[in-house]
Amino acid sequence: MKKYILDLTVTENVRLHANYVLLKLTSPSPLPDMLPGQFAEIRVDGSPTTFLRRPISINYVDRQRNEVWFLIQLIGDGTRQLGEAKAGDTVNVVLPLGNGYTMPQKPSDKLLLVGGGVGTAPMLYLGEQLAKNGHKPVSYT
């Protein structure tokens, strides 16, 4: 799958908890194909301690809005800076990275999606894609 380096615009940064934010980024053009379970490398500017990009799981892709969401746990300088991003800010990302989940070929009566903490991030997009393919994902939070 081809990789892209994109400058995306922050549309919303929602504080979900003291240590978690939902960062929504939009593109002026259609987003590339992304699979559930893939991730992006997000550049954090403005600090000497954040030289490397941060790997963040793709939480959801809204094709109608050309928007990609990231659930971010604020655990270090880089993720804390991302947690401070404001609507209108530009964020540079490399995506999609990783292989994503192997999707079942035959529709199933029930599939259990399990994740904890920030590990729940890719479950939203995975559940939606499974449902589109005739599966019935079960979730428990």
Ranges and model annotations:
Residues K2-A87:
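Ferredoxin-reductase
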Residues A40, V91-V94:
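Generic structural signal for buried aliphatic residues
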Residues Q73, P96, G116:
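Cofactor-binding loop segments of dinucleotide-utilizing enzymes, especially the Rossmann-like FAD-
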Residues T90, K110, H135-V138:
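Residues at the starts of beta-strands that form the adenosine-phosphate
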Residues P96-K106:
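A short, basic/flexible loop-to-alpha-helix module at the beginning of a structural domain
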Residues P122-A131:
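Histidine-anchored nucleotide/phosphate-binding helix
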Residues T141:
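Conserved small/polar residues in nucleotide/adenosyl-binding loops
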